[in-house]
Amino acid sequence: MTSLILYTPAGVLAKAAPLKLAAKRLTKLGFDVAIDAAALEKHQRFAGDDALRLEAIHRVARAQPGVALATRGGYGLTRLLDRIDWSLLARSVEAGTRWVGYSDLTALQMGLLAHTKAPTWWGPLACDDFGRDELDEVTPDCFAEAMTGALEAVGFRTEAGFDGLDTRGLMWGGNLAMLCSLLGTPHWPKVRGGVLMLEDVAEHPYRVERMLLQLHQAGVLASQKAIVLGAFSDWKKSPLDRGYNLKTVVAHLRSLVDVPILTGFPFGHVPTKVTVPFGVKGHLVVQGRDVFLGWDEDHAHSHHDHGEHGHDHAGHAHHEH
């Protein structure tokens, strides 16, 4: 049975109920679940003060569980980046720990990649996903398969026009606002020739465009093999838009960057999300409108898992839509 620790490294958990529900569901999925002692701490909008949250991260790293799953994102990891013991986290990855999350966890994933090249996992958050009332089938199934080493690829549908695309590169990215906040810091991994995956929430398309243009003008976008856009959810239209939306943002970006920009990736602040490795060489193939994103089993998982036989679950996500 794979050990799994739930910890809260950023925003405060307002209620304990979602944490209990998440622990129950994850146990049913077959994980040996433990909850970090400080998971429900409160300090202002954070899950405890900076020292407490930093120690929680280090405590999880020293425990070296099979899975380190954050309860939620919010805001708070940026405060800790200059103080995290990156080599301690990297040693936990080497020992087999899969660090999983998205949203504010992008800071941890980017920092770990920048400082140590250790891979992590883009995936659900315990309370936001496993702790909500209604849980879809794709999210837990994909997560469980990824955490046990059975998952080697995911699939989704994109727009027409990319048939025949076949490229390889380091899978990286995350929350767009978080990425922009890390540009120019020591916690920015200088990835060239990568597959850059992006998502965000509650950002109007003009703000999304401004952040994408920042990455473009910093030379980040043009140096990638492909850009894969997940969900940009929960934004409100303005009467000033006059037809301006996310589609026009993508069209404008495509006019500037000679790199394939794919949409439709099932990830971000949405109910259904896949789990994929971060900081691992990926293989992106498009057939018609079907996108298959695979990765090297040996590099995505620790040496403890190399004896397991991986399966190709391409199409895992889009068959459910």
Where are these regions (language model features)?
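N-terminal glycine-rich "phosphate-gripper" loop used for MgATP/nucleotide binding
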Residues: 67-83, 102
